[in-house]
Regions:
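C-terminal active-site subregion of NodB/CE4 polysaccharide deacetylases
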Residues: 1-92, 100, 159, 176-268
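A short, conserved beta-to-alpha structural element at the edge of catalytic cores
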Residues: 113-135
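Acidic (Asp/Glu)-rich catalytic clusters
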Residues: 66, 107-113, 146-165, 220
Length: 268
């Protein structure tokens, strides 16, 4: 009996250290911004399965948020009403513009009437942008992922649930570009997406989360009013709208882990 109690205590300690469920929640008046990429089944042996949230898991996550009374907003709505949102406001975001955002994620969002923002790379087809960050990531895995075509982007934009934002022309690593090239990535993508959806594009996501103060200023110059990073956390009541933090949702997270991330803002 003593042995069993000892084992249970050890397991409980390990669980508590891993998940820190006991930590107090970040004030629920502070909105949460979630970062997703794909909603699709995992690929055996694939490098980027952490970017792939299984549809059944995504359904559970959105269903739980809905049941808990979360208020879903787009990024522009988040900015426009900052400080006046109800408790438990959440902005779901997707990076890159994968086809599964329409085929798998959108029906779930529609089912729960949950709004989201999709940051689209303009030149997104057959492009292995993972090599722009790390040259050895040259497997072509992301290049082979089907992307949204322009008609589908417009369809999502007209759905009433989806805001389309920019993720540059080529998913560029802005840190490797000079001022002129960086500004072109920012402005051209904005203009082309606006021409496609016939709406202003005001929301932006820094590719790879790699950026400097120069890029913040260039994004403002290009006409964006808010931008998200990959820095994990929950912003304060008075945030820098051009450097908003997000909560990363991994394809390897359990629902329990996702709940804790929403509570604490990052992996415990």
């Amino acid at each position: 009996v003593i042995y069993i109690v000892f084992v249970v205590l050890i397991v409980a300690m390990v669980f508590s250290l891993k998940y820190a469920w006991w930590k107090p929640a970040v004030d629920w008046k502070r909105p949460r911004v979630l970062m997703y990429h794909m909603v699709r089944e995992h690929i055996d042996g694939a490098k980027f399965n952490k970017l792939r949230v299984k549809p059944a898991e995504f359904d559970k996550q959105v269903a739980w948020m809905k049941a808990q009374g979360f208020h879903f907003v787009t990024m522009q709505e988040l900015q426009d009403n900052w400080g006046n949102h109800p408790e438990k406001t959440v902005a779901i975001t997707f990076d890159d513009g994968y086809l599964d955002n329409l085929e798998n994620a959108f029906p779930i969002l529609e089912k729960y009437q949950a709004k989201a923002t999709i940051y689209v790379v303009v030149d997104r087809h057959d492009r292995d942008w993972s090599t722009y960050k790390k040259a050895h990531h040259n497997s072509g895995e992301l290049a082979h992922e089907p992307k949204l075509n322009d008609i589908q982007v417009k369809q999502l934009s007209n759905s009433g649930l989806i805001e389309i934002g920019s993720h540059t022309m080529t998913h560029a690593n802005l840190s490797k570009l000079d001022d002129v090239a960086s500004l072109k990535e920012l402005t051209e993508s904005k203009h082309q997406i606006e021409a496609l959806i016939a709406k202003p594009v005001t929301s932006f996501a820094y590719p790879f989360g790699i950026y400097s103060q120069r890029d913040v200023e260039l994004a403002k110059q290009a006409g964006y009013s808010n931008a998200v990073t990959t820095k994990e956390g929950i912003d304060s009541i008075s945030p820098d709208f051009m450097q908003l933090q997000r909560i990363k949702i991994s394809g390897k997270d359990s629902l329990f882990a996702v709940k804790l991330r929403l509570k604490l803002g990052k992996r415990a």
